[in-house]
Amino acid sequence: MPFTGYELHGMEKIPEGPGLIVYYHGALPMDYCYFICNLYIQTGRLCYSVVDHFFSKLPGIELLFNLLPAVHSGRDESVKILKKGNLLAVSPGGAREAFFSDENYNLLWGNRKGFAQVAIDAKVPIIPLFTQNIREGYRTFGKIGFFRWFYENSRLLLIPMYGGFPVKLRTYVGDPIPYDPNITATELVEKTKIAIEKLRDRHQKLPGSILRALLERFDNHQKED
């Protein structure tokens, strides 16, 4: 991807069978779009995407979701997709993480554990995913108190952002967390969070810097997968 010099590392860690991909949500998840495109080009596999219900209400967006393909109808549908042998991806932080996380790349999952229960019910592994510099390409005004108040009271995805910077993006696939019939959803959430934070701490200099992320376009050095 020439605009961001996008790279994908660790594709071989994605199992051939079904799996639930869990990723950190940037202000604008263009890294995830690049990921699913690369996945299809290199393997011919589609990856279903869990999206916010808000988008299903927008005119014409249903057609796009059918092409992706996307899921916004709940846990049961997600389990069915996985049991059919497909890949499914979700960002537990969702819009809140997109708008209100910052250059420290904190995971904002709250008490969400539905994704973990989906993986348990479908008996599939969880594959952690993290993209270096995704927070530097686009940023939001989420630190301004009014916008946090507006979102929490309306749930409308209308928080302004700025950016479009051609920063270096590298997506890293972590080691799958295998299905364990004896684990609880709460425990699996914690294991997944730790796995993504390890990817972040290994591949992302904190706090993030737009200038540094731009300069990394000219730096061929990268941390090992």
Which residues fall in each region the model found?
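Short, conserved catalytic or adaptor-binding loops enriched in Gly and charged residues
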Residues: M1, L63-L64, Y162-F165
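Helix-to-loop junction immediately C-terminal to a conserved catalytic motif
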Residues: M1-H25
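Short polybasic/polar patches that bind polyanions
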Residues: P2, N66, I120
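A broad, low-specificity signal marking well-ordered, structured residues that form hydrophobic/aromatic
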Residues: Y6, G19, C47-Y48, L88, ...
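Catalytic core of membrane glycerolipid acyltransferases/transacylases, capturing the structured
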Residues: E16-S78, K84, A95-G110
